Amino acid sequence: MQFDTIELAIEALRNGESIIVVDDEDRENEGDLVAVTEWMDDNTINFMAKEGRGLICAPIDKSIAERLKLQSMEQNNTDIYGTHFTVSIDHYKTTTGISAHERTQTARALIDENTNPEDFHRPGHLFPLIAKENGVLTRNGHTEAAVDLARLTGAQPAGVICEIMNDDGTMAKGEDLQSFKERHHLKMITIKSLVAFRKAVELNVNLKAKVKMPTDFGHFDMYGFTTDYSDEEIVAIVKGDLKSNPNVRMHSACLTGDIFHSQRCDCGAQLEASMKYIDEHGGMIIYLPQEGRGIGLINKLRAYELIEKGYDTVTANLALGFDEDLRDYHVAAEILKYFDISEINLLSNNPKKFEGLEDYGIEIVDRIELIVPETQYNHSYMETKKNKMGHLI
């Protein structure tokens, strides 16, 4: 499939057009027609009903639902993707409520600040959906994508969506969506690209605390951050001037190595070496909650069980159903942007960290190698990192 940029999609939506939004392959893997309520007209709903053929819904921000007292359709939501339907509605000025014009009228009433809860008949023929707070950064659904896209166009946080079905009633996927796009001259994007766009242009980290932190390796300033879209807590320790190409280490948390000094890995030794380097040369360490390359502590211990049976660190992850590395570095990039940093010297042997930061607009000026001694217990682990994961060691 050929996808368009988010910028082109935003422009099309502002012009009152519908676009196609495709979700992830491991989710519904389907395409929805999406339009912004503020910019759409009767033709939008008619096109969705005639060509899309799916259920026409109206994604809205939680604040709209609360203001208009739109209650959940079902208190015990058992939908496999957690789609948050409210009771269906018709605006009181409609007749049957089903025509394209009347569904447009109902959708437009949702974003009219003069609309009152009593202005809707319930049930009706339009199905509002409540988007999760923080949108696609919290849930990778078409509901959240529609509301996020509406905001990005400068409109009220509301849209209309409709699943795309083939002529035979099956769901359009892959080449079917590509043909639909070409036939109707529509822009098409992925939710994944919308997530990346938002992460690249928005600052979603919040400083919650700053303290002096004396350590065995020197005296640092420690900053505590949270994010808008998860319950993660991230710390950064800083020393010296950060203005010109600061030295930065992104360190993934490793309880076994950092705290218990496990010799199965080189994590604890790398953290200590990084702290010594930053103490001497200045810079920052961003400590990320990415235990076990993102699989979590217990799963890392399960991977160790497999390693004891002859697996390596990569094949163990794969055997447990994970990719070899689940880490993403957008939070680190956002923390750097919080400090107005766009160019760094990176303390790392891992090329994926370079790529991960560059994907979010951070330029790597120089690499500072971080070589620590092997132990008798981590030789195989180090060889796997070098030979299978491309680490520069």
Swiss-Prot record:
Domain of life: Bacteria
Stretches the record annotates as GTP cyclohydrolase II: 201-393
Active site per database record: D325, R327
Pfam families the record matches: DHBP_synthase, GTP_cyclohydro2
Protein residues bound to Zn(2+): C254, C265, C267
Keyword Cell membrane: no
One GO term describing the cellular component: cytosol
Annotated metabolic or biological route of this protein: Cofactor biosynthesis; riboflavin biosynthesis; 2-hydroxy-3-oxobutyl phosphate from D-ribulose 5-phosphate: step 1/1; Cofactor biosynthesis; riboflavin biosynthesis; 5-amino-6-(D-ribitylamino)uracil from GTP: step 1/4
Gene Ontology terms, MF aspect: 3,4-dihydroxy-2-butanone-4-phosphate synthase activity; GTP binding; GTP cyclohydrolase II activity; magnesium ion binding; manganese ion binding; zinc ion binding
InterPro entries recorded: DHBP_synth_RibB-like_a/b_dom, DHBP_synthase_RibB, GTP_cyclohydro_II, RibA, RibA-like_sf, Riboflavin_synth_RibBA
Protein name, as recorded: Riboflavin biosynthesis protein RibBA
Gene, per the UniProt record: ribBA
